[in-house]
């Protein structure tokens, strides 16, 4: 009996312990901070006192402390790495003056000196070792001085001149919750997670600064001054942004007095504190009475130049507060502040947000609604934004869309709406939904339940925000709007000022609704589209393009087309295609053209069908392309011009390999193409009976098989590309490797290195006839001319011209030299054996660029080419073993048109020019290339997945 009683007591005790451990708890961290701004050195000197209360069932022996200004300390931080991955080198190439840091920390815990240890990976996190363990339900007083050098505003916080955005600025405890510690480095893509507490902050600034901050201002005199002040007129000067290619207009305020003032702000039950200071702010304020009778003070801080868009900003804040209070629950704070601060982009903090107006009043309304809405999602419902960004950004987006539909009847507002009716009729009613559909259609989306830092930059906005908004709409449809609203209001009531996780949200929704929502919530962890009401598609014809209601229509677009070459002259026709978003599996483009000179119908076209066999963006494309134009002509003795036509058909198979890392900008593919080409040749025969010459244009057929393997990384820092290509035709095989590597310069531009190595083989014996027949396929030191474009893949104005300007066109292939020796029967550097070359291109430094004084930029570069080939290594070779050329290059239209002026070159080229071009030599040595076929959207925007 005693044993049974003992077991019973143990069981009851154990049950009690388990219940206690499973009960919700969260830490409380109160902050008292004194800080002084030095607006000459752009520094902060402060002292922080934390009252850390351990409400957990665990004894703590250390506390992780975030020192986030150290994210800007050097180029070896998580912030820097992510910025590079997201396509920005601004911080990476910034100088020490533009960077920031935090130092002079001297922690004491309950009056006892405490040591810190560095985080094993991140410079902006330290481990505070507690002198004495902190048991459950006990508190510790932690204090330290700190010094911050504010960086330029590369991300959310810092300064731009004397405009200050002071965010993530003080030593701050990381969260310890039921899932453990959550130390996290500062990231631009990826927000935060912090404990609730009560804040009292004293800010000392020069007295002519207007300050906006979290919480309620305690200085009555300052409130009066803000309402009565008139900001000074700005004195604009042009300053260059760190790491930027072009100077940006930044306002330099009129110098003010050196006297200071100390402002006191208080706010309970928040998890962060931010403040903003500028002498140029215009300040407006008003009040709003909520249904409960509580009065909220709404204030805006904006700049004079943006006054038109901000004129009704107070009304916008009021609408945001009213709708969110109605749909979710009443706004609990007494103040709400919105700050005009587009320098660092928008970001929300408790009771205050900084944002860009978006360029119009309507877009400002949209952004204010979104950022003020974050007071509910993450400000009050304080989920872990870094791990579960959908719980704040996505839920908030759902309510953005709901507000936009109610206020404007569309979710697009003015962000993408054009003043042109033509454009508006072609823009989608739901742009974000269209982008979600587009990314899921090609299987390059990611699950909604993905950590912020694991999204690529495109998906972070499309998935965490927009796709989650779609998922919330699905949840609303399943529950019905009244029940959905009841669930969300209960979620807010139960979890306000707490840290909900996804499982908490699911449990509550199922409890309130009485539904099993396993299938719906499972969608959060899956790729693919959110189920939408089914729609039948019809075929619709439209002019140019349309993104309107692509879920209902399969579009066929028509647009006028124009073309030109030397033989056909002007060509007019139509462009037919079905390219739109989301991409369809079957795509086509067809452009029939009528040539005004040759009086024949030409054209170009392509059809493809794509399969997506995996779940990581793999793609198998089957395609066929074709083209038919005049590639030459012949004028007979009677003056009749006979065009010589070429026609090609090129079936192909292309496979894009999977990319395991969605954030990677790496692309790999393998492609097989067969070119079936028919060319009209020129044939002279003699009629021996009638003693006349007969000219005919028989068709000649040939083929070429081509295998390519390409690996390309369009990362912003040191992008590269490598291509292996094997061509096989009648009697030969041609192998080539082309590599490109770009070395970035700190202030824009860089050194572009290209290398080529090629080898030519004969199948069977090498004969004079084979040498003659394979001449267009052989390796060239100089960029090949039109007749050497053996697959007709490049655009040439005069493909077979040997005089006038059109004869000076080359293509960037093989050795890539810019000097031409077209008049030689055996061009210098042409070989049917092997060839190696390197090409370097770099911007011309302003110090020696005479055109740098112009008010507009002319993209002049310097090129240098060096190479060798088999013939140079033979006995008694006419050239040295290595040849070179160098000169100036003018690159226009994103390098589509390049003009080359050789100035220095090997002796063999000098001798050629002297012997063949005795006078007016300069312009005849100029070359140019037109590289339309190399246009690649991903080189300009690597994060775009299309």
Model-derived regions, located:
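Transmembrane beta-strand segments that form the barrel wall of outer-membrane beta-barrel proteins
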Residues: 554-566, 572-580, 584-596, 618-630, ...
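Hydrophobic helix-coil surface modules that form long, contiguous segments used
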Residues: 173-181, 190-369, 398, 443
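N-terminal, polar/Ser/Thr-rich
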Residues: 20-45, 160, 519, 531-550, ...
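A surface-exposed beta-strand-loop module
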Residues: 53, 88-162, 249-258
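Hydrophobic alpha-helical and helix-loop surface patches within well-folded domains
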Residues: 3, 28-29, 51, 265, ...
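C-terminal outer-membrane beta-barrel translocator/porin domains of Gram-negative envelope proteins
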Residues: 560-562, 602-604, 618-641, 650-654, ...
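Short loop/turn motifs that connect adjacent beta-strands in outer-membrane beta-barrel proteins
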Residues: 548-554, 582-586, 612-620, 658-670, ...
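Glycine/proline-rich low-complexity spacer/linker segments in large multi-domain proteins
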Residues: 75-89, 147-199, 288
């Amino acid at each position: 009996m005693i044993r049974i009683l003992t077991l019973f007591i143990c069981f009851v005790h154990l049950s009690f312990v388990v219940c206690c451990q499973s009960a919700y708890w969260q830490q409380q961290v109160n902050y008292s901070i004194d800080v002084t701004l030095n607006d000459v050195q752009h520094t902060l000197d402060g002292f922080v006192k934390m009252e850390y209360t351990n409400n957990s069932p665990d004894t703590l022996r250390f506390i992780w402390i975030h020192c986030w200004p150290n994210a800007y300390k050097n180029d070896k931080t998580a912030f820097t790495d992510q910025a590079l991955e997201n396509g920005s080198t601004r911080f990476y190439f910034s100088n020490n003056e533009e960077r920031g840091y935090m130092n002079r920390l001297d922690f004491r815990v309950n009056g006892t000196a405490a040591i810190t240890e560095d985080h094993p990976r991140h410079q902006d996190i330290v481990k505070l070792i507690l002198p004495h363990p902190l048991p459950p339900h006990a508190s510790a007083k932690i204090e330290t001085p700190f010094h911050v050098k504010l960086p330029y505003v590369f991300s959310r916080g810092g300064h731009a001149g004397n405009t200050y955005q002071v965010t993530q600025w003080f030593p701050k405890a990381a969260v310890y919750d039921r899932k453990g510690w959550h130390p996290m480095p500062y990231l631009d893509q990826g927000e935060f997670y912090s404990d609730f507490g009560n804040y009292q902050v004293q800010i000392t600034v020069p007295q002519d600064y207007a300050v906006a901050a979290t919480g309620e201002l305690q200085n009555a005199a300052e409130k009066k001054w803000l309402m009565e002040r008139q900001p000074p007129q700005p004195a604009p000067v042009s300053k260059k942004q760190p790491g930027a290619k072009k100077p940006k207009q930044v306002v330099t305020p009129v110098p003010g007095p050196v006297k200071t003032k100390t402002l006191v702000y208080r706010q309970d039950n928040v998890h962060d504190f931010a403040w903003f200071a500028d002498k140029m702010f215009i300040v407006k304020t008003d009040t709003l009475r909520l249904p409960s009778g509580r009065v909220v003070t709404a204030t805006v801080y904006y700049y004079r130049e943006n006054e038109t868009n901000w004129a009704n900003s107070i009304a916008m804040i009021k609408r945001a507060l009213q709708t969110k209070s109605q749909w979710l629950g009443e706004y609990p704070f007494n103040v709400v502040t919105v700050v005009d601060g587009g320098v660092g982009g928008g970001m929300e903090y408790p009771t205050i947000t900084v944002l860009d107006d978006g360029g119009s009043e309507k877009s400002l309304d949209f952004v204010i609604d979104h950022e003020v809405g974050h007071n509910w999602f993450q400000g009050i419902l304080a989920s872990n934004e870094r791990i579960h960004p959908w719980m704040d950004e996505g839920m908030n987006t759902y309510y953005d869309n709901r507000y936009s539909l109610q206020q404007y009847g569309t979710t697009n507002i003015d962000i993408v709406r054009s003043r042109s009716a033509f454009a508006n009729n072609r823009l989608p009613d739901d742009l974000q939904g269209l982008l979600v559909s587009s990314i899921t259609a090609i299987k390059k989306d990611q699950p909604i339940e993905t950590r912020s830092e694991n999204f690529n930059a495109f998906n972070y906005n499309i998935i965490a925000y927009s796709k989650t908004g779609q998922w919330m709409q699905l949840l609303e449809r399943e529950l019905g709007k009244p029940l959905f609203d009841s669930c969300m209001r209960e979620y807010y009531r139960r979890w306000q000022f707490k840290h909900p996780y996804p499982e908490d949200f699911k449990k509550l929704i199922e409890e309130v609704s009485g539904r099993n929502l396993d299938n719906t919530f499972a969608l959060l962890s899956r790729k693919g589209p959110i189920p939408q009401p089914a729609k039948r598609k019809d075929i619709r014809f439209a002019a140019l393009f349309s993104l309107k209601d692509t879920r209902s229509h399969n579009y066929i677009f028509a647009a006028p087309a124009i073309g030109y070459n030397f033989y056909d002259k002007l060509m007019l026709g139509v462009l037919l295609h079905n390219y739109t978003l989301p991409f369809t599996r079957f795509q086509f483009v067809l452009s029939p053209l009528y040539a005004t000179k040759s009086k024949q119908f030409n054209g170009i076209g392509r059809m493809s069908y794509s399969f997506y066999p995996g779940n990581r963006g793999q793609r198998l494309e089957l395609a066929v392309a074709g083209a038919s134009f005049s590639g030459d002509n012949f004028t007979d003795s009677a003056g009749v011009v006979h065009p010589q036509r070429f026609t090609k058909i090129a079936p192909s198979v292309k496979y894009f390999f999977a990319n395991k890392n969605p954030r990677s900008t790496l692309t790999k593919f393998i492609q097989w193409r067969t070119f079936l080409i028919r060319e009209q040749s020129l044939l002279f025969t003699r009629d021996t009976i009638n003693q006349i010459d007969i000219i005919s244009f028989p068709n000649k057929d040939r083929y070429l098989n081509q295998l390519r393997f390409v690996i390309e990384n369009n990362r912003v820092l040191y992008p590269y590309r490598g291509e292996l290509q094997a061509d096989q035709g009648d009697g030969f095989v041609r192998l080539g490797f082309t590599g490109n590597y770009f070395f970035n310069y700190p202030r824009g531009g860089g050194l572009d290195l290209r290398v080529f190595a090629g080898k030519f083989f004969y199948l069977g014996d090498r004969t004079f006839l084979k040498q003659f027949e394979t001449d267009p396929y052989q390796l060239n030191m100089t960029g090949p001319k039109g007749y050497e474009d053996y697959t007709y893949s490049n655009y040439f104005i005069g493909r077979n011209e040997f005089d006038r300007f059109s004869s000076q066109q080359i293509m960037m292939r093989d050795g890539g030299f810019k000097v031409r020796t077209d008049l030689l029967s055996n061009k210098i550097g042409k070989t049917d054996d092997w060839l190696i070359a390197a090409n370097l291109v770099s911007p011309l430094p302003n110090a020696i660029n005479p055109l740098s004084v112009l008010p507009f930029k002319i993209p002049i570069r310097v090129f240098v080419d060096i190479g060798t080939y088999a013939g140079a290594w033979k006995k008694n070779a006419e050239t040295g073993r290595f040849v070179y050329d160098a000169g100036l290059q003018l690159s226009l239209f994103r390098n589509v048109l390049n003009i080359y002026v050789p100035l220095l070159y090997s002796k063999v080229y000098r001798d050629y020019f002297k012997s063949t071009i005795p006078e007016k030599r300069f312009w005849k040595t100029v070359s140019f290339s037109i590289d339309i076929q190399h246009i690649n959207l991903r080189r300009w925007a690597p994060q775009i997945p299309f």
